[in-house]
């Protein structure tokens, strides 16, 4: 097994390929990509034996923007016999001897064509899990050091990749997709983007400390209030900045103040630092990056989650430019900061970015 399979949104295979090629090279790992447009996954084959496993251990999954999941795989199994699909899969795993495995996930790419396989995948998981346990596998806790999850990626009927991923360096979600329910009281479906962003970027154990009823937030381009809703739900008082109307249900909470202003011109009150800045405005990504940079550098906010709408072409390059700009500006000012970005399931032609400023470096 010396390949990586990376799941992604259909249509973003080239961005995923460019990113894994760059990140692998930074670790001294080289290889080539096999991809099919709109397939929802890519294969990165390493030149050196053992390098795929090294990437699965050392390349931090949270650093990948476009990948929803990252697993080590071998050659594709094709034309699995209908009367016994399990034996060829077990045979591939026997070469690995995954004694430190915790569970099995039988998945597909997130495409309309592949989704037709999901019913089969669910049914197939039960006998496969039983067979793997008979081999003495799937016995470890997923929290055990060095434990791995076993993953099968069915790309079409009878054809699959057999693989694994380390539990401390992968998405915890089936197919890399969190299953979120749209709250009936939320003003718009965009609320799911911020909910997924918080789930992705903020450790669950820290969420109640990072969002409290003593905090204030600003939502730039807030109307009708999908993102504001997520902050208010967590107790934050929000200045909702937009010329449009906010949902009446949000006004009724008493936890928002509507500021009918231009999001690019709005400034917080002097000597008041905002805890959370959120922004989901439709604008050129570099213009949004400069706006967010201004808020952080001026000390107007401590933490921010925002979306960057991507162009039709050179999307990965545009992301690199925007993130490099923000990192460079914050470095110039001597800030300690953490920056993460992800192409979330609820994002479309956009990515979501999180930046937390932790103070300034000593001079």
Curated annotation (Swiss-Prot):
Q: Where is the active site?
A: 309 (proton acceptor)
What does the record give under GO molecular function? S-adenosylmethionine-dependent methyltransferase activity
Which one Pfam family would you cite for this protein?
RlmM_FDX
Annotated S-adenosyl-L-methionine binding lies at: 190, 223-226, 242, 262, 280
Q: Which reaction does it catalyse?
A: cytidine(2498) in 23S rRNA + S-adenosyl-L-methionine = 2'-O-methylcytidine(2498) in 23S rRNA + S-adenosyl-L-homocysteine + H(+)
GO CC terms, sorted? cytoplasm
Tell me which NCBIfam families the record gives. Answer: PRK11760.1 (NF008734)
What is the protein's quaternary organization? Monomer.
This chain belongs to the protein called Ribosomal RNA large subunit methyltransferase M
Provenance organism:
Actinobacillus pleuropneumoniae serotype 5b (strain L20)
The record lists the lineage as:
Bacteria, Pseudomonadati, Pseudomonadota, Gammaproteobacteria, Pasteurellales
């Amino acid at each position: 097994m010396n390949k990586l399979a990376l799941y992604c949104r259909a249509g973003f295979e080239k961005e995923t390929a460019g990113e894994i090629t760059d990140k692998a090279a930074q670790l001294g790992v080289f290889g080539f990509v096999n991809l099919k447009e709109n397939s929802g996954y890519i294969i990165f084959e390493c030149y050196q034996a053992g390098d795929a496993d090294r990437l699965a251990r050392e390349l931090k999954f949270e650093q990948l923007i476009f990948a929803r999941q990252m697993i080590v795989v071998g050659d594709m199994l094709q034309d699995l016999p209908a009367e016994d699909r399990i034996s060829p899969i077990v045979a591939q795993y026997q070469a690995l001897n995954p004694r430190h495995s915790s569970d099995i996930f039988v998945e597909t790419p997130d495409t309309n064509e592949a989704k037709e396989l999901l019913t089969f995948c669910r049914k197939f998981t039960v006998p496969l899990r039983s067979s793997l346990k008979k081999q003495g596998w799937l016995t470890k806790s997923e929290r055990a050091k060095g434990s791995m999850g076993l993953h099968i990626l069915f790309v079409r009927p009878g054809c699959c990749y057999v693989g694994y991923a380390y539990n401390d360096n992968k998405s915890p979600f089936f197919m890399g997709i969190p299953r979120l329910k749209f709250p009936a009281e939320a003003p718009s479906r965009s609320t799911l983007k911020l909910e997924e962003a918080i789930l992705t970027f903020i450790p669950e154990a820290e969420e109640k400390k990072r969002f409290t009823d003593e905090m204030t937030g600003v939502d730039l381009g807030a109307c009708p209030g999908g993102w504001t809703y997520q902050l208010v739900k967590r107790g934050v008082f929000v200045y909702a900045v937009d010329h449009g109307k906010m949902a009446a249900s949000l006004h009724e909470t008493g936890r928002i103040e509507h500021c009918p202003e231009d999001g690019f011109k709005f400034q917080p009150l002097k000597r008041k630092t905002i805890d959370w800045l959120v922004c989901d405005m439709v604008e050129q990504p570099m213009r949004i990056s400069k706006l967010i940079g201004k808020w952080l550098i001026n000390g107007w906010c401590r933490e921010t989650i925002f979306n960057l709408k991507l162009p039709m072409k050179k999307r990965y390059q545009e992301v690199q430019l925007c993130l490099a700009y923000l990192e460079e500006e914050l470095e110039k000012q001597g800030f300690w900061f953490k920056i993460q970005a992800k192409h979330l399931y609820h994002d479309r032609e956009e990515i979501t970015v999180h930046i937390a400023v932790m103070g300034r470096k000593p001079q």
